[in-house]
Amino acid sequence: MTVVTENTRIQSVLPVSTPAQVKAELPISARAAETTLQARKAIQDILSGQDDRLLVVVGPCSIHDTAAALDYAGRLAGLRERLSRDLLIVMRVYFEKPRTTVGWKGLINDPNLDGTFDMQTGLRRARAFLLEVGNLGLPAG
């Protein structure tokens, strides 16, 4: 009698898109690219002491409701503009729950919050969200 001990807890195996595939499906806009480039330069200048503004990274623990998070981003973008002389505001965007051992694992792993672990959808939803935030002129990190 042969006893199977390998892969006994695997229910199915599905392919996951490569980063290049997701980027091709959801390309970055000129506005989002410029937001990213300018923010990286400004952060570098702050950290090296060439810019005396305070770098402020704010945002939710982890995103599960992209519509609510986009509303938050819109409000934060307005604050970013008003306070730009003194602060560089970056939205904290986190999609996973790294310290969670039970329950929901995060937007990328389980975007539908139903235990289906549709990572294909999760990866695309996360990228689309980041692109929308970048299009608001708000850097994300």
Each PLM stretch: what is its role?
Residues 1-9:
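N-terminal catalytic cores of peptidoglycan-degrading enzymes
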Residues 8-50:
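N- or domain-start disorder-to-order transition segments that initiate the globular core
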Residues 14, 28-35, 64, 68, ...:
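Catalytic cores of large soluble enzymes that bind and process phosphate-bearing ligands
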Residues 22-28, 57-60, 109-112:
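A generic short-segment signal for beta-strand/edge and adjacent turn/coil regions
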Residues 35-53, 64, 68-82:
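Generic N-terminal targeting/processing segments that precede catalytic cores or assembly contacts
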Residues 53-65, 90-94:
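Short glycine-rich or small-residue beta-strand-to-loop segments that form or flank ligand, phosphate
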Residues 71-141:
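A generic, well-ordered mixed alpha/beta core segment in the N-terminal half of proteins
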